[in-house]
Curated annotation (Swiss-Prot):
Protein name: COPII coat assembly protein sec16
Keywords: Autophagy, Endoplasmic reticulum, ER-Golgi transport, Membrane, Protein transport, Repeat, Transport
GO cellular component terms, A-Z: endoplasmic reticulum exit site; endoplasmic reticulum membrane; ER to Golgi transport vesicle membrane
Gene from which the chain derives: sec16
Each Sequence repeat, start to end: 315-341, 342-368, 369-395, 396-422
Origin organism lineage: Eukaryota, Fungi, Dikarya, Ascomycota, Pezizomycotina
Location of this chain's protein in the cell: Endoplasmic reticulum membrane
Biased composition (Pro residues): 596-621, 671-680, 743-763, 1810-1827
Amino acid sequence: MAQSDVAAVWNPALRSDDNATPVPTGPASLEIDTSIEATTIPLGSPMETPHEYSISDIAFPDSDTAAPPQEAASPDMIDTEPLPNPDQIPARDEVLEAPSADVEATPEISYDHETPNLDAPQTEHAHDNEAMPLDDPEDQVTEAQPAQPQAEDSISTEATAAQDMDVEEQSSTPHAGDQDGTEPADTNGEAHSSHDIWGSPAKENSAEDDFFNQLKTQTKPIYVPPENESRFEEGVPLLDDSAESPVEPTATQEGQIDNLFTDDNDEDDGFFKAVQSSPPPDKSQPASHITRKSTFQVMDSLGFSLDSPMSDADPAAQEFDNALAAATTNNSVGISAFEEDPAAQEFDNVLAAAATDNSADKPSSEEDPAAQELDNVLAAATTNNSVGISAFEEDPAAQEFDNVLAAAATDNTVRKSSSEEDLAARWQAELAEEEAEVAPSEDDLAARWQMELDDDDDLLLEDDIGGATAEHAPTSQNINGATAGAAVPGLSSPFGTPQSSVRPGAPATAYTPHQPSTSDLLQGVPVPGAAPPANMAASADYFTQPPRPNVTANKAESFAERAKEGYRSPYDLPEDLTRPRRPVASHKPVVTQPGSTPPPPRSNSIPIPPPSTSMPPPPLGAQPDGAQSTAKVAAPKNFYEELPLPPPRPQSRPASSGRYTPGANAMPPASSHPPPPPANPYASLSTAPPAAAEAYSQPQVQQPEGLDPYASLSAPGASSGPAPPSATSRYSPKPPTLQAGIKPPPSPRYSPAPPPATAPPPRNRYASQPTAPPSQGVALPFQPRTSSPLAYHEKVSYRPQEPSEQQPSAMEQPAIIPPIEVQSQPTAPAEYSPIQPPEVPHVPEAVNMGSSVHQMSQQPMSPPRNQYAPPGYVDEFSKRIAPIANVPPAPVLPADDPTFVPPRRSMTQSPSQQTLGPRLSVPSVDPLQRPASVHGAGSPTKAVNPYAPAQMSAHNRVASQSLEFIPPTDDQQFDPLERWKGAPIVKFGFGGSVLSCFPKHIPRYSAGQATPKIKSTPGEVKTHQLSDWIPVPDTIARHPGPLKSKSKKKDLLAWLSSKIAAFENEGIPQAVYMHADSQKRSEEKILLWKVVRVLVEHDGVLEGSPEIQKSLRQIIFPHLQDVDSAQPYGNGLPSFSTAQSLDAPSRPDAADPQAVESIRNNLLVGEREKAVWGAVDHRLWGHAMIIASTMDKSVWKQVVQEFVRREVRSASGNTESLAALYEIFAGNVEESVDELVPPSARAGLQMVSKVDGHGTSKNALDGLDSWRDTLGLVLSNRSSEDYQALLALGRLLQSYGRTEAAHICFIFSRAAVFGGVDDPQASVVLLGADHQHLSLAALQDEDSILLTEAYEYATSVLSASPKPPLPHLLAFKLVYAWSLADQGRKSEAQQYCDAIAATLKATTKPSPYQHQHLYFGVDELSARLRQTTSDGGSSWISRPSMEKVSGSMWAKFNSFVAGEDNEAGSAGSAKAGDGDIGPFAKIAGTPTVSRSPSVSDIYGSYSAQPSYSSGPSRYQPNNQYAPTSSPEQLRGRSSLDSQRSSSYGFGFGQRRGSQEPSTPVESNMYQGGMLYNSPPAVGYQSTPPQTSYMPLAPVKEDLAPQAHAEASAGPVEQSYGSGSPYQPAGYGSFDQPFMNQVPSDGAGYMPPGVSSGYEPPAIESHPEPVAAPSEEVNEEEPAKKKSFMDDDDDDDIAARAAAIQKAERARKDREADEAFRKAAEADAQKPAPAKKSWFGGWFGGAAGGKKEDLNPNKPIRAKLGEENSFYYDKDLKKWVNKKDPNSATAARATPPPPRASGPPSRTASGSSAAPPPPASASPMMPPPSSRPPSTTGMPPPGSPAPSSLGVPPPSIQRSVSTGAAVSTPPSGLAAPPRPATSLSNASSIDDLLGAPTARKGAAAKGKKKGRYVDVMAK
């Protein structure tokens, strides 16, 4: 190519199209060209742009010679530039001698054809440093062959291309020599002294030695622009005859690029010059004239025979050979791309590869785009070539060539060191091959260069890039000269060029750290070379990228190009001139590169797998740039171990290598050993190359790790050794070996480019990094990249980090994590296996980049890493999955090196995960790298790993977890579950409370133990609210339930609207998501809620008004709204249907005259039916229907049905709904649904209609979807029986699981049955809940419960004609109340309990759903709620509450007023009450008697409990405490147990045992009279006031009234005997349950307490009862009362039985006047005490005198005498009742009798009291037995009561009714209830106060007290 072309080559803007697309000279050239394309930098790319300086000017004194090197440096840029003509470059016959099978016959590349030259160098470069092909084919290849048999082998495989390229380069050497004559080839591993690229190996060797020496000692950027430029200017041949020249060929190509950069940057030139000056490790080998070795020879020379400690010169040579072979393969492709000018094109490819890396660097070093880019390429090449040189030292020619390749691949420093002449020769050879191949188009080159420049980004200063690259290259070169060379081979070897150079743009970039921003990113994400190092030698070579598609494709695919996709124009200025910020796509091209590159490299790289540690094995393709690290990486592995880690030179910016070169930086060291699956270049991609580069750079200059944006920075860092912490590793301590001075290459996260392969195995940012700082690893999260890393980051973040990351220190292990390959090489999933990548260290950078790109793409294939998941976990998962994805997991995470970067997965993982075993040592963790490793692609977000700090913690965690526990010595240590170690304990309690206890692990140290042992002890027990842990989602509107009044309507509508909106927003509920009709059901659910909202909004009406119809129509047919709104506009205009009818004139049915005549004839005869069917047969439907309308209804139905079948259903369209409507009109209601789903379909059959042919045309079940249309038609056209059709439709829908739709139909039908689950006739249990197909758990859905409650509210509360509430819904309300309590919403739960109790009380007709279990459940919940709310905790010491305080005060006051305090009974009751009130009231113990009576009172008042609770229970000390005290009493009785058991239904027996007498009585009352009725409700209400105990007791009564009677203490049943005990109890409970109950409860139990507290009412009643039954009876009653006083502890049964008998006798016979007189006297005496006890007693005193006066009159009046008549007071009236107002007395006595009965039983005046109780008791007796029927039992008791005392039974009924209403009476006592309530109150007081009931006076007082209590209750 012309010299101008050369200048254009390195400057993409100046490069010409012919350079971009050189003509391939042959298959080798084609191969090289491909690689060149992969590495070729777009003409517009910065690498090319610098070409404004002619390569000859910059790199070579001779412009002719310079051109090729520049092209080599940046194939894309230089493609247009003609490299030195083949005649100038010594013919590489020697190289051709052993043409490699990998290397297709590479025609000699004239300098005009730079691409061929590139091909050879790239191949070599791919293998070692792309330098060998570039080196003088004659001298260096020859030397390389002897010096490095492996390199020779690889060359032999690549020999054809390489030799041809050498020869061509030699022929073109004059150009290269001229350009490189002054400049060392080290800069890019290209011929720095192009005039003597192949010819002056000695000079090259010396330069390389100097370079390596400088790298060893140098910590600053390797670039020394003045020196480098001078070296180029001096014309020092990059490749001498010495071994150096073989390495240099690759370097030569890059050397030109470097020289270009060198001209731009003296600093870079100086650096490369220094590199040249430093003798390459392999320099020792004789500097025989470079002759192109056979691929095998090159491979042998590369065979890890690198100078670097990692590999010997032979391995380097072998690896170089492999790289050369891969490069040849790739270069052949690249050459094909550059067929126009093979030499120029391959050189362009090489230059593109170098430029790709350098471009990333060049953006930062824009000052001299050409010089910097060339320097960057040279730096990458040097880094790679250094390794290659070391490998080729044995054979001066071959080794120097390898070294040059290594230098070119690494940082081009080695390339500079290699003679520029050799480089020129090699470039010519490569260019010749490239020309033979297709020269990449200038556009491609420009795009590549631009992408490279973009990769470099502004953050990547060109100087830094060059320096960083140089540093990395020298470092890796010194460390692994062979490795660098191996990586560089891509430049020199045809194999490496296409892949490496083209893919990365400058594949060397992948391995060349000089482009820190991009290359570091790539390195962070192991440069493709790293991932496929072994596999992708060619791709690794900067110029060897044969697998890579044509330059354009590669460019698109290459990471750098992708980064610069937006900057691809071949005319765009290079980044040096113009700094593109971050083309997002530019990174991907590099990634893509491996995709195209990998195939050949894989074949090449397949060989690489064996050399997991040895570089020769790495595939040449992988070797090129990435291979530099890869092939060299084999050495680098050892290199890290062997190579001293000089402090990495702090890079002013991350490794100069472009984002594509990041792999180059870290890659050479990374791939000290080829990844076990080198075949998968992507798998190995991330491993060795980056690591090699890093390690390489660490010892020497510590080139910043070229972080693969996708490779974890840590991995590259690990490979590079103490690489400066990458930005990602910022959070983790820098590896101790990190050299802060060296600026780690920008973390790949900024560059999405897949160069990760380039990067040495991405260090686990979370794992300690190897001592060698991952120079590439430093990726500052703030550093921008030219391309957005996000494109790859997500992939990488989810991709397991490559083992390379885990292999930190060993260059072999720190393989570059394969960057995600945008190019899409998912084939290498294994590459992502953390283990595998380390094996790939040999893959050339370009290859690594490509493979890393592939890996990046593949990584997603491997278990995607969640970048947000802690690395530790992600790493584990990636390890599990990634190995699967990555077939070769061979490279195990370097456990040996704690600094080893964990596999790539660590990249995506948090440090904690990567801090696995080896990572416990954090020293090598790069804070910056850590994010990269976490995120894999080094995304900006990933770069900063929030988990990075966790890395340390993770280590600690592991350590802490490993601590041993101190086992107990009490045999607990034998527990197989090891519970003695402690475990969290969580207990969920009532009311949403949660107890938690977490064990405490206390470390205990013992003598002689370095680590403590853990002692597990119980932790603190804490109480929480469940809502604190699981917040209940707050809706916009809270449910206003319970819904009791119309005032809740507005709130309910708001709540319904909010729920509907929530349903619409949330979409398909998860519950029905799996349902086949989930979408439909979701819509139907919303529709159901809307219908209920309309129902509530219109007060339970769904039809009748246009407004309602419109609302429903809008809901059911939302689309009709538009029609309605559009109607006004259509007024006067025909509707659409009308227009259709106009368009298609209607045609009357074909009227067959004969058919009409037949109908007429039939009608004439009178055979209408025959006429009808004749009309039907002839489809004369009008005739048929008219005639049928006059006939029987059945005929009409049949005709319509036939019409529907034949005319409607046969019509096309959705006619099911219309057919159903017609059927309904015809009266075929049940059959109407058959039109939707035919019976055959419901039966599971599919019938085929032969008539209409539509039988199988559609799914028969599709008709279900017409339910909405059908419903709308029916609602809009109501008929008499359409409700039945809606029922049938609902049942049909329900049978198919369309529950919501079915319930909508049921609601509109207004005939559906709402019932319980056990009701087979029930159509609906809960709206929206399918009770037929789903489990009962579905019936606990809160939404369904509340929706049904809203429906009930609308129909029963809001409706003008309310329906009865749904009885079965009470149980579900209780369930909801429990759920509220569990949520901590106890007040709302209490409200529901009260509402349920009120409903039960208000119920007049018992329902089977109102049963004892429901009562008990309400009582239990209410009791618990009262306990929790009043006590405020579970403490056994109840908190004082106003209720308690007021209750105790009122108890004392009542007792004082009643005078019970002095009474033993009252005192006892008071004591009992006090005990209940006191803090120890709940603790068992207080007298069971008092407690049982209290319970009995509670039960007695249970029916009246509402009043009791409202009044007496609240105010009575004991009952007041009943909420508290009554519960306490229960507890005292061990009622806690009973209470609990009662709550469960088991303890009732226990309670009753203690409370049996009273409980049975009340329970009889409730159960007998009100099991399902109000009594239970009353009981519940009463219980609420009494708290848990009251409810519990009633529950017990309700639950086991009989059982208690039976099970209750023998006294209960015994005393109650058969029915009588219950009768008294029932009677007493109704009239004054306390009197009766107390005795009944057991005369001994509560009588005292009961009498004292409640006797006042009882006393009141006593006079009345006495009067009512008879005086004798009354007298008997007092006696009984006394006996009861004595018998408080005795059973009431006997007393009641006697009292009953006496009462009956008194009522029947009415004793003699004496008896009456006695009764009157007794009555007179009673009133006085009563008056004393009561305020009325005062009046009673006067009355008493009157009574005494009247006593004589008694005989006059009859039994009672006139005395009663004298007294008109209530008491007197009672007496008077005997005279005139007997009936009135009886009526008035009616209420008292219970009281009297109560007192008589208590007082032992069983005769008088007995009669009334018996009367009531007798009724009650049936209840006990009939008690289960409860309600029925109740009425009977009431009715029987009248038997003896007509009035008392009513009172009993009242009490019973009050029992139901009793709960209500507490607040307001009706006259009848009032006695009952007073009685109940008295009984409650008695319960609390004790047995004072024995005394009549006390009883009277009790009466008053009861009144007071009642008043307070009110």
